[in-house]
Amino acid sequence: MRRGRSLLGGLLIGGVALAAVSAVPSPPWTPTADLLSAPLPAPPPGQQDLLRAEIERLGAGHDGEVGIAVLDVTNGWSVDYNGQAHLPQQSVSKLWVAITVLGAIDRGDFKLSDTVVIHKEDLSVFHQPLRDRVGPGGYRTTIARLLAAEIQQSDNAANDALIRQVGGPWAVQIAIVGKSLGEIRFGPGEREMQTRAAGLTWKPEYSFGRAFWDDREKLPPARRRAALEAYLANPPDAASPLDIVDTLARLQQGELLSPQSTAYLLDLMAGTQTGATRLRGGLEPGWRLRHKTGTGQVMGALATGNNDVGLLTAPDGRVYAVAVMIGQSRAPFEARQALMQAVARAVIASHRPAGAVPPI
């Protein structure tokens, strides 16, 4: 008790002294010139600013024409580098075929289980694994299997079969316009687009063996170069990274297809087998990617249409739409793949809380 009285007395005495001091008026405070002229400290950069700076650094540092866009589907903001450039899609355009087909299924025009027969004269050019299954009587399959081959294996013959199913390339373009997917172009289909870009005219032999490559190599280099440059100057399958990430975000949010068809397409994209060293090569444990790749023709050191677009999902469920499009580049293959991986890593790093350590 004695100690308590002593403490109380001290507090009372101190309070009286403080009151006495406070009663004495002090001169008004005036800021010095240095304080008046000193700028306020900038707030720490946010996730969007950090990601924008890194995306711009990556895009500007690549030897070629590059477009990159990232859209935070959860919060609605986006960053980009050259995001409005209209660049060749190549097989990225297979996404719009799938959306057109599934939209027709939603309307009741046909079903996933409907049968489609593919004959040798229906085959396409370049990568088409189902070609080996087409015998003298054709190959009987379903729309569901063609969609899986088109998205997951980037099978050109499967893609062409689905285009025929919905009414041709123009039907796909009508679907793109009808769903307000920006300025995305679909193009005339693989046969015409690839042969024209090579300086050739389509003929059925190009579906087999090395006939396409042999004829292309016989062309005078100047003719082939002129054809490829004409394609790059005005790609019939052009799209901008910003339009693509906007479309992917709308797909994720269920704005383009029925809930069943949306889930179906996203599941197909999760099983994509191409592009292991592109965006997917930059993932960390716990992150998921649903995507579609595209790859164009190569002439000497010039590579065209190297793309990967998709939806990156964080362990906490936040989703980012990402598009990396390399319209043309003389950078080595490894550098092109590294750019796509670096973009994925940049998104992941920007999502991570400040000071957090990446998982091992």
Model-identified regions with their sequence ranges:
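Short alpha-helical linear motifs
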Residues: 137-142, 186-187, 214, 285-292, ...
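Structured C-terminal helix/loop/strand segments within mature extracytoplasmic catalytic/sensor domains
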Residues: 3-6, 10, 17-58, 169, ...
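Active-site-proximal helix/loop microenvironment
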Residues: 183-258
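Short, highly charged low-complexity linear segments
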Residues: 155-164, 185-190, 205-221, 302-313, ...
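Active-site-adjacent loops and short helices of periplasmic peptidoglycan-processing enzymes
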Residues: 25-201
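A short small-residue
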Residues: 77, 133-135, 226-229, 324-326
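Tryptophan-centered motif/residue detector
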Residues: 77, 96, 201-203, 268, ...
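Carbohydrate-binding/catalytic loop surfaces
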Residues: 139, 200-207, 288-296
